[in-house]
């Protein structure tokens, strides 16, 4: 008899995901694992996959990014948001670029620092930088 997973034992079928019915969570994609003492294998390949997944999921500045930044600050984290890694959609009465600008100005005013990806020292995928904070908040 072959071994079974817990899910198989209780009768749960394998899950499937599409970008319309799931949430992407990038867990612990930190530079320590790419270049530090805890170096993992196949970093370049996993970064490509993470970047591809992230480009398909996207996010919104006025909800996801601002809420994560605010919560991170409330929990005592030093919050950094990468400006050129954030976008949004237009909402009634506000164009997308204006919404991003206002949401990030609110972050800068009270909850954290907004930087450009070019300001990050070392080799890192800038868009993933923001998602490190999400992982810490979960």
UniProtKB/Swiss-Prot annotation:
Keywords: Hydrolase
Coiled coil residues, start to end: none
GO molecular function: hydrolase activity
Reactions catalysed according to its record: [(1'E)-5'-(3',3'-dimethyloxiran-2'-yl)-3'-hydroxy-3'-methylpent-1'-en-1'-yl]-quinolinone B = yaequinolone C
Signal peptide: none
Short name of one Pfam family: Isochorismatase
Pathway: Secondary metabolite biosynthesis; Alkaloid biosynthesis; Mycotoxin biosynthesis
UniProt entry tagged with the keyword Hydrolase: yes
InterPro entries for this protein: Isochorismatase-like_dom, Isochorismatase-like_sf
Class in the EC hierarchy, top level: hydrolase
EC number per UniProt: 3.-.-.-
Assigned protein family: Belongs to the isochorismatase family.
Role noted for this protein: Isochorismatase-like protein; part of the gene cluster that mediates the biosynthesis of the aspoquinolone mycotoxins. Within the pathway, asqB converts [(1'E)-5'-(3',3'-dimethyloxiran-2'-yl)-3'-hydroxy-3'-methylpent-1'-en-1'-yl]-quinolinone B into yaequinolone C. The first step of the pathway is catalyzed by the nonribosomal peptide synthetase asqK that condenses anthranilic acid and O-methyl-L-tyrosine to produce 4'-methoxycyclopeptin. 4'-methoxycyclopeptin is then converted to 4'-methoxydehydrocyclopeptin by the ketoglutarate-dependent dioxygenase asqJ.
The protein, known as: Isochorismatase-like protein asqB
Source organism of this protein record: Emericella nidulans (strain FGSC A4 / ATCC 38163 / CBS 112.46 / NRRL 194 / M139) (Aspergillus nidulans)
